[in-house]
């Protein structure tokens, strides 16, 4: 279909290039090191922020072949040892304790079963490994949250399953991650209904 195969992937890719979003990426991605797994590689927007000297290899988990194709130009400009993994985050086909860093940016919002995905992330991480993330989340403000709930049904259609009302902090806590070393705020230059973000580096 024209919408799902051409228009929607490009709209999502474009939205992920806004200055506020890019600034969030720059806060966390440079800390990735070793054997790295990126959940929801998309069209490769995180590539410029990786410290190539710290990356042994990068696996891009991306179930969409369309998104994989959109990332081809960015991958041509990268010297990182890279391969795609065409799979879902809820069932990662990698060995337990095999990854040094898992990266997840603006992906938990659209994964059908985020709790299962976080469990899988925890499984593949080595002891001492790190989970690096930045995500938008449910607003703590009643009025903003009400607006999020109102428009979420339409937003999920436009954003390929993106949920506005998922509480990312709560998801992380219930999945056994230590959320003490995380930050959250409304990021400047972004509408409040999509502007409350949480990010951090969590060690296993």
Predicted segments, located by residue:
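Conserved alpha-helix/loop element of class I SAM-dependent methyltransferases that forms part
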Residues: 15-35, 45-49
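Class I SAM-dependent methyltransferase SAM/SAH-binding core
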Residues: 37-91
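A short acidic, Gly/Pro-enriched loop at the edge of an enzyme's catalytic core
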Residues: 90-102
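A short SAM/SAH-binding and catalytic strip from SAM-dependent methyltransferases
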Residues: 100-113
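A short glycine-rich, Lys/Arg-flanked "PGG" loop and its adjoining helix->strand segment in the class I
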Residues: 115-127
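Conserved beta-strand signature within the Rossmann-like core of class I S-adenosyl-L-methionine
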Residues: 128-136
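Short alpha-helix
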Residues: 160-176
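Core SAM-dependent methyltransferase catalytic element
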Residues: 177, 182-204
